[in-house]
C-alpha cells in the first residue's frame, strides 16, 4: 500500500482491498493502513519506520502479523527480532514526495501530464537517483537509491527482496547464489546495519 494516500485515493484503495482474497497480506506503510487490521492480515512496512521494542509491541498488540524493520535498524536489534523481515536486497526508497517534478520541469498541468519513467535526480557526486511515480487518482513520487542495498546472509531474519528497479535479474541471482555475497556487499552496501547507534 502506498506511503502517501490522499483523501481522493482512499475510495479506490478501499475498493481494491475489498476485492482481495483472504490469503493476501497487506503491507501497511503508513498509519492509514492499520484501518484494515480487522479485515485483512497486515505486515507493518518500511513506511512505519519500526526500530524499537515499543513500536513492535504496540503493533503486535494491535494485531499486526509481522513487521519489516526500519532501514536504520542496527544488526544487534535485528538479531533480537529474527521473526521480523529486513529489507535485504533492493533499491530502497530514500524519499516520498507529492510535489510533481514534471509540472516544475515542463510547466504543464496534470491534465497534460508529461510523465517519463526516465527522470533522474543527479547529486553533487554525479550519482543518479531514479524517480518513480505512484499513481492512483493523484500522484506521488519516490526517490530511489542509486545503488542497491545488499545485506544478504548477514543475519537470520526473514528477508524482503525488492526487485523493482533491477534492470538485470542475473545480478540479483548472483547475489543470492554466490558464496561471495559478503564481498559483494562492499560494492553494493546500503543503510541497513550502518546505523548511528
Model-derived regions: residue spans:
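Active-site pocket-lining/capping segments in soluble small-molecule metabolic enzymes
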Residues: 1-58, 62-197
Amino acid at each position: 500500500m502506498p506511503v502517501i494516500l490522499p483523501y481522493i485515493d482512499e475510495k479506490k484503495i478501499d475498493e481494491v482491498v475489498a476485492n482481495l482474497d483472504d490469503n493476501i497480506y497487506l503491507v501497511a506503510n503508513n498509519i492509514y493502513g492499520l484501518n484494515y487490521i480487522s479485515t485483512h492480515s497486515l505486515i507493518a512496512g518500511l513506511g512505519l519506520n519500526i526500530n524499537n521494542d515499543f513500536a513492535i509491541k504496540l503493533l503486535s498488540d494491535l494485531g499486526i502479523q509481522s513487521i519489516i524493520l526500519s532501514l536504520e535498524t542496527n544488526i544487534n536489534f535485528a538479531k533480537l527480532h529474527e521473526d521480523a523481515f529486513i529489507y535485504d536486497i533492493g533499491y530502497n526508497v530514500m524519499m516520498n514526495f507529492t510535489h510533481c517534478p514534471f509540472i516544475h520541469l515542463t510547466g504543464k498541468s496534470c491534465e497534460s501530464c508529461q510523465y517519463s519513467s526516465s527522470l533522474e535526480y543527479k547529486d553533487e557526486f554525479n550519482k543518479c537517483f531514479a524517480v518513480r511515480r505512484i499513481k492512483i487518482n493523484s500522484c506521488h513520487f519516490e526517490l530511489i537509491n542509486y545503488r542497491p542495498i545488499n545485506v544478504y546472509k548477514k543475519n537470520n531474519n526473514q528477508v524482503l527482496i525488492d526487485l523493482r528497479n533491477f534492470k538485470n535479474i542475473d545480478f540479483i541471482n548472483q547475489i543470492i547464489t554466490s558464496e561471495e555475497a559478503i564481498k559483494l556487499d562492499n560494492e553494493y552496501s546500503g543503510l541497513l546495519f550502518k546505523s548511528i547507534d
